[in-house]
Amino acid sequence: MLFKDQLFLASQYAAPHHLVSRLMGLAADCRTPAIKNWMISRFVRRYGVDMSEALVQDPLAYDTFNQFFTRKLRADARPLDTEPGAVLCPADGAISQLGPIEHGRIFQAKGHSYSLTSLLGGDPARAEPFMGGDFATIYLSPRDYHRVHMPCAGTLREMVHVPGRLFSVNPLTATHVPELFARNERVACLFDTEYGPMAMVLVGAMIVASIETAWAGLVTPHKRQIRAQRYDEAARAPIHLDKGAEMGLFKLGSTVIVLFGPGRVRWTDTPSVRGPVRMGELLALPKA
């Protein structure tokens, strides 16, 4: 391992994750034109952000960096795959891993896996429907579109906010930080779908100031205790989201993990590990 990589990993354990993220969140909400314009311009140049797809294409027209970062796209920018039964990719990014959930563990990187039960907040009953199922992990890079959409239509059953660390998420940390995705702060959303139970886990990372959902708004920042909110109670109006509907967003981004139960879906040949994907592309089909 290169010395600079060793230093980076050491800094991940030493850094005050949540303080850094809160400070970044304050800066990202700054409305002072000179400051926010400098931040946006530097970001666009560094990461080569394609603004031609954005609903508002002038990057300096946004009031804050966060508004720019969570920009909406033109209606025609992400057409949804029309194959019957298609399960869609929920976000722009790259497939970092996908495959079966084996012995209650999800593959992270060579030599590393993490607990399905821990990922979903530590409740074995919550994890049970996904034992022996399938997962896909999608990493959102800084230049990507950072809104997350439904892979298929679903009715919300439960949302769980799991506090945790905020390690950076990238190939280096995935390879060297054990249980990375089950240690970082995350929001797990469980749905009932035509393919059975589905979970979408939005994982935070260093400088991810907040995670929001379409129905609850701001879910993070950091709280000390796991919070689970049921949405399938008789007293509550059901929350149903159509295929392709927006379900959440990152203010600065990280990772989305999609889970299905056993025998429900098969990943298509289209997504490949480390390969780029776009929201709305075909990700999986129902198993025969």
From Swiss-Prot:
Zinc-finger as UniProt keyword: no
Record pathway: Phospholipid metabolism; phosphatidylethanolamine biosynthesis; phosphatidylethanolamine from CDP-diacylglycerol: step 2/2
Site (Cleavage (non-hydrolytic)): G253, S254
Main location: membrane
Catalytic function, reaction form: a 1,2-diacyl-sn-glycero-3-phospho-L-serine + H(+) = a 1,2-diacyl-sn-glycero-3-phosphoethanolamine + CO2
EC nos: 4.1.1.65
GO molecular function: phosphatidylserine decarboxylase activity
Domain of life per record: Bacteria
Disulfide bonds: none
Active site per the UniProt annotation: D92, H149, S254
Entry similarity comment: Belongs to the phosphatidylserine decarboxylase family. PSD-B subfamily. Prokaryotic type I sub-subfamily.
Protein name from the UniProt record: Phosphatidylserine decarboxylase proenzyme
Lineage of producing organism: Bacteria, Pseudomonadati, Pseudomonadota, Betaproteobacteria, Burkholderiales
